[in-house]
């Protein structure tokens, strides 16, 4: 068994890597000891509360680390050459035109992937991930908006079922495990 102190939920935990046969045995032992299985929906809600990015939803091959709030991982001051360095240097120099932000929505409506983000009635961005947060008791989302609107406290809207739902840009993560 290989144990990695990693995870994708923002909670304390570990990932276990083992053979399929050993995995089935361990699964049965855990069930016999009262562990309650959960599905991808629970994992994705925890991921969103922790504001952890999901590739293909919150970022893709066209997203720069600076847009996604991951610029702190890019160390252009180091002399190493790597594929994509020139593109990252250009992106860093010009600055992002959009940013990934956290949104809290008023009411119980849930923003979903690809829902339009509105400002003064105009579409200005797009939701990448959204869900009801059982921990916070409110709807939350990640969305890309123009950099000038990516300020904490900025009032925006999300179009949900043809209606504008009020939303506010908030600090991420939405929830941090104490």
Please tell me what each predicted stretch does.
Residues 1-178:
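Conserved, structured C-terminal
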């Amino acid at each position: 068994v290989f144990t990695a102190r990693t995870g994708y939920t923002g909670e304390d935990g570990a990932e276990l890597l083992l053979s399929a046969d050993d995995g089935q045995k361990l699964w049965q032992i855990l069930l016999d000891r009262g562990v309650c299985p959960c599905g991808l929906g629970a994992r994705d809600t925890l991921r969103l509360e922790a504001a952890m990015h999901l590739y293909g939803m919150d970022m893709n091959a066209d997203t720069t680390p600076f847009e996604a709030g991951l610029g702190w991982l890019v160390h252009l001051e180091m002399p190493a050459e790597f594929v994509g360095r020139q593109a990252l240097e250009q992106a860093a120099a010009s600055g992002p035109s959009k940013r990934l932000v956290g949104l809290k929505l008023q009411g119980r409506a849930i923003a979903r992937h690809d829902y339009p983000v509105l400002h003064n009635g105009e579409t200005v961005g797009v939701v990448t991930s959204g869900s009801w947060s059982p921990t916070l008791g409110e709807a939350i989302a990640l969305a890309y908006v123009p950099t000038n609107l990516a300020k904490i406290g900025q009032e925006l809207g999300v179009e949900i079922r043809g209606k504008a739902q009020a939303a506010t840009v908030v600090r991420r993560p939405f929830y941090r495990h104490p």
